[in-house]
Regions:
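N-terminal accessory segment detector
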Residues: 1-126, 153, 157-159, 165-169
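Short, non-transmembrane amphipathic alpha-helical segments
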Residues: 130-144
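Conserved short beta-strand edge segments in small beta-sheet-based binding/regulatory domains
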Residues: 145-150
Length: 169
């Protein structure tokens, strides 16, 4: 890492360990194949996911599979025992550096926090969907609330807004 911090990398029988945490290498082509090939499988799609993932700028034929990947990656993080401590000054840059950067998912930038809404920008790259899913998981863990995520695809990346799903929170 660029801050001179050393990470302990170990090869395991299945995958890798980074500082004692299990990690796996996922080929970008695998994620693309999942997104492109699973769009037609809507029989078991939970329609309530449309309430928590609001996506604009992406072709409709890919929305179902993208939402499933987003939700899966968020749930994968939520199933972990990783703590996220958000200070009063919204230290999202530190959270991104410690929870995303070491795993190759650091191409996200915190833009603003106001009125309970956090805004992020994610670069347009092969990991973008994974990054968005995990940042939403980080947000939910840090805030202790279920979220709704608004995703807008632009020419250069994704603009993300995350807020509480429930209006009284």
């Amino acid at each position: 890492r660029d801050k001179g911090q050393m990470l302990m990398l170990e090869k395991r029988s299945i995958g890798w360990g980074i500082n004692g945490k299990s990690s796996y290498v996922l080929p970008c082509d695998m994620i693309n194949r999942i997104i492109y090939n699973s769009g037609g499988y809507t029989d078991t799609y939970n329609k309530s996911l449309d309430d928590v993932w609001q996506i604009h700028g992406i072709d409709n034929r890919y929305l179902t599979s993208i939402v499933c990947v987003l939700q899966s990656f968020k749930q994968l993080f939520m199933a972990s025992d990783v703590y996220v401590f958000l200070s009063e000054n919204n230290n999202w840059s530190e959270i991104i550096n410690s929870h995303l950067g070491p795993f190759g998912l650091g191409s996200v930038k915190h833009i603003d926090t106001s009125n309970g809404i956090d805004e992020f920008a994610v670069e347009l790259n092969a990991n973008a969907i994974l990054i968005i899913g995990k940042i939403v998981g980080l947000w939910e863990r840090a805030n202790g609330k279920q979220s709704v995520c608004f995703i807008d695809l632009t020419d250069t990346g994704f603009k993300i807004k995350i807020e509480s799903l429930l209006s009284y929170n």
